[in-house]
Amino acid sequence: MPDVTISIWTAVVGFFLSFLAYFFKKWCPSLYVYILTAILGIGWIVYVFLDQGFIKTVPIFFIFVFSFFSSPVPERSKVQLQEIIDQLKEQGAREIVLSKNKERLLVDFLFSGLFIVIAVLYFLFGPDSPITLILLYSFVSLVVGLTKRVELFRALRLFYAEHEEVLYAVSLFETKKYPLEELSEVSVQTRPDVLQLFQLFSLFSPNMDYTTSMGKTWKLSFSGEKVYFTPDPSESMAFLLKEEIHKMEEVEVKPFYHQNNWKRLLGKWYFAATVKGVGAYAALITLFTLMGIGPIVTTIVMVLFWIFNLWISDRVLKIALDMKKIDDPDLLPIIEKVFSRAGLSHVDIYVTESAEYNGFAIGANIGRSLVALTSETLKLPHEAIEGILAHEAIHVKKRDVLMGQLLRFLLIGLVLAGVFLFYKAFQNWLEHAQIFVFLSLWLLIFLLPAFQSLFTQWMEVRADHLGATLLDGGNAQMANSLTILCEYQDRALEKSAGYYVTFEKEQEANKKDKKISSLERDSWFFRFLEFQFMSHPPMYWRVHSLQTTETGWSIGKIKLWWCSRFRESLPN
């Protein structure tokens, strides 16, 4: 592993060069600026190579690339931003004054600060391990997120263009336009629900958080995106719902520190520290290191802690994702029918709020499992929801969540054991063969997700075909369910991408871009990536395999998937 100090300085250099490029582009052609930053970046990498050696320089290089491209550099200059604002005003757009209070920023700094402190303590006192790189990635991401939040707080402007019926959100980092014709739901909260908005407390893509105070918050649900903002109390928002606006009731949101939110706060923090990140593991390792506890005991405790987290994963995620039991009287008979046929009448079905279309199973075994659907998924036709539920029911019945975690643990354990034994056997030779060691390590990194994909895709294909046996329509209904799911998701993604405001040249290029459907057979390279490295086979193949085979699961279908996995990964 590379030196922690060098790793942090590399991230700083990446940030610095990114900002340097941003400022120099105001006076110099972009090509010259990129050449200059490339020379400076290569110079830093060469310095690290001479100081750290070949193997340690490789992760340093990726740290540099990540920090350079993820740095919070504005998308536009202030001049370009002002041009957009002036153009909106010339067109008669009305500015919506925002309520601003630094308390909102302090909450983000408080939440992020807890995880940043854990990372810093590990950097200072923790042992040298791969966790260092994971924490550094999280550290950089949090710093970038905080920087963007500060800039958003300082410079965000909202406009409503009445002639277009479009809401504009204008900032240095991005400018978006939201047509009110895509607005499906409006609600008002007494304050922003920061436990829902903070980036580490969400499993899905983060919401568009434009909140700049702890006051009354408007939540707008557009196709593919949910937007939150805090207008000044003096602003009239009647344009959003016309006559219905006066009939709306405010949704009361308690402060995050309120007694009623303690369970949510703890659950979301635990989720961020154990599921979405490694903060809890890093904190324990740092504590054990300071106490002088040896690596063997530390490793045993970490494994037991991982097993414990797997065991309580259903309860943690239920709290962290604010799940609620589905009580729709139209859906309850469908749920009862599907899960009774699967022999799983005791499994609870929940809904979690998200703009994505998705469903997933949670839990270490049948007795502690649940199935969750996103709020957008519940808007699909009932026949499609039935197919999604049948797919997830098979995951629960076959204990796929538990098996997937155990297989991942087993694969990583075998790789580490193999590396350790190989190093012990050829230690003297390996110390003089750094190129071989480097290539071998990257081959293992390359093959690990491929092996994992092999098992997870088999589980997904099995869930499709066995799930079809729970449906009245069999394979045809399951294929139709997946098709509808993809069509809705693709449409939402297209709408979300269309909210970005670009300059005329960029708009011309975007118009020429071909829209790619998830149901269409892609080029061989992307098919190769999906079949060999992703957890799910490509959707076009899943639908096709259902449409061209009989309902049921057999050795023949395993052979079909196995052959397609390699045949479809080859050039046409």
Model-predicted regions and their roles:
Residues 1-16:
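Hydrophobic transmembrane alpha-helical segments in integral membrane proteins
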